[in-house]
Design a protein with these regions (language model features):
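Conserved catalytic-core motifs of eukaryotic protein kinase domains, centered on the activation segment
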Residues: 7-13, 71-74, 174-175
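Catalytic histidine-centered segment of alpha/beta-hydrolase-like enzymes
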Residues: 194-203
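Gly/Ala-rich beta-loop-alpha elbow adjacent to hydrolase catalytic centers
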Residues: 38-42, 46
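Conserved alpha/beta-hydrolase catalytic His-Asp/Glu region
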Residues: 72-77, 91-155
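Conserved serine/cysteine hydrolase catalytic core
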Residues: 129-181, 187-190
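Active-site loop signature of alpha/beta-hydrolase-fold enzymes
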Residues: 4-7, 68, 171, 197
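Active-site loop/oxyanion-hole signature of alpha/beta-hydrolase fold enzymes
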Residues: 1-37, 204
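Flexible "cap/lid" loop of the alpha/beta hydrolase fold
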Residues: 48-52, 58-93
Length: 204
């Protein structure tokens, strides 16, 4: 993804969406259709694919995330929202990025089930190596968020779709999944004794 790993960086003043980058990548590799699998932010992007590019999908697998409950590009950031973000960024800098990373890490660990310890080392490595650009800047709306709903209402894509959530005492999610209202071939699967990072806890 742009802004993560060794991909090119994001900027505050260029509007793009991750889903557009994904389709551009598919085009460059001459991939007409693909099985799209996403976890967390990847789940948000997979929901965007269902809303905007269902014709490029063979199936969808959305884990620990589907429609993000936030504004999309149809509603650009207002001056008031920008001011709030500036205050949040200043507060984070005062608090310290390392403190924020540790809190995030501990929250993800706590969300897990009985197999959570198997993810401790690799999860911390990923978080530790992340440059934290996103929380330190006014990021553009890189996922469609609630804009997805309007698109899905129009198309009701027939793409076979599986929504997957992990169930543990400290992993909260809604069993009423609004996106399924617009996916005639969509299903919800709950994985017991598992948290947000299900791919690391229970890869089998």
């Amino acid at each position: 993804l742009r802004g993560y790993g060794i991909s090119s960086s994001q900027t505050e003043d260029y509007q793009f969406m991750h889903v557009e980058d994904l389709v551009t990548l598919m085009d460059s590799l001459h991939i007409k259709k693909a099985h799209i699998v996403g976890l967390s932010l990847g789940g948000f992007i997979t929901a965007d694919m269902l809303a905007y590019f269902p014709d490029r999908m063979l199936s969808a697998f959305l884990a620990s995330g589907n429609i993000r409950k936030s504004k999309g590009p149809s509603e650009p950031m207002t001056k008031e929202e920008a001011k709030v973000r500036d205050e949040e960024i200043a507060a984070l800098k005062k608090k310290g990025v390392e403190v924020m990373k540790k809190e995030w890490f501990e929250g993800l660990m706590k969300s897990g089930g009985s197999q959570r310890e198997r993810m401790r080392a690799p999860l911390w490595q990923m978080i530790d190596e992340w440059d934290a650009w996103q929380p330190l800047h006014k990021e553009v709306w890189v996922v469609a968020g609630l804009d997805d709903i309007e698109e899905l209402k129009k198309s009701h894509p027939a793409v076979p779709s599986l929504i997957v959530e992990g169930h543990s005492s400290d992993n909260k999610f809604s069993k009423k999944t609004p996106i399924l209202e617009y996916l005639p071939n969509g299903k919800l699967k709950i994985i017991e004794d598992c948290g947000h990072m299900m791919n690391m806890e229970r890869p089998e």
